[in-house]
């Protein structure tokens, strides 16, 4: 409709939550935090860690930078968006902005030179 190319990429999928998927927070029992490991590096209930999500987000951004696109719109999910915003703002997956309100349909805008991320 707008004359733009639409592409899908599995690296933009939501964080995999393993055995916790399909359950509400009230249905889940709290899991003990492993000693000596940052919570963002834990694969809770067999799912993905935030480190895993950050790895695929870095890969995606590297690929986008290599394409030298003038503008890109990314559509993704909550935790993945939070990780992407953290990367674009120069933060680690261990230091994400959990106070940032990301509701369904949120639009976040960043003007970034992807070639300068590293």
Write out the residue ranges for each language-model feature.
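Active-site catalytic microenvironments for nucleophilic, acid-base chemistry
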Residues: 1, 63, 67, 87-91
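Phosphate-coordination/substrate-recognition cap region in phosphate-metabolizing enzymes
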Residues: 1-33
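Domain-level recognition of soluble alpha/beta enzyme cores
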Residues: 7, 91-117
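Short glycine/proline- and acidic residue-enriched helix-loop micro-motifs
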Residues: 33-52
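Generic structural signal for well-ordered alpha-helical scaffold segments
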Residues: 54, 58-66
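Generic beta-sheet signal
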Residues: 68-78
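Phosphate- and divalent-cation-binding pockets in alpha/beta enzyme and binding domains
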Residues: 83-84
